[in-house]
């Protein structure tokens, strides 16, 4: 998100917008087709909303600690390896806290989408991505409170923060 520690949505958006311009120029040249220009402006609107959400998150004390973090571990005779999109950090009451975030891009999401996609009706995990990420993060940050969730990207960004219990718990949280 560019200026990692900025709480200014205009500064964050300015960075993201200039990166979009640079990428568009290298990919599509100086005179992209009308359809491409429309898509770029649509994306620019999404980036503006992402900048607002990021600035609000920063104002709440969260900072981006790491991105694209590789991990591997063994559990129960299985080897796990992957890459966490983003890890945020915050001090709360003297105890460090970390939020493991996975970016998701979809066209439309309902308030019940995340829960129904990732938990059974009984509240048991059926999509193990976040529990695996939390397990990895618990080794990266021993003794820290770990939360997890999704940073959804569709027509607008939405981010909500809840603390998850340990990865084996059936409770679910979204960002």
Language model region names:
Residues 1-175:
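Structural signature of nuclease core domains in nucleic-acid processing machines
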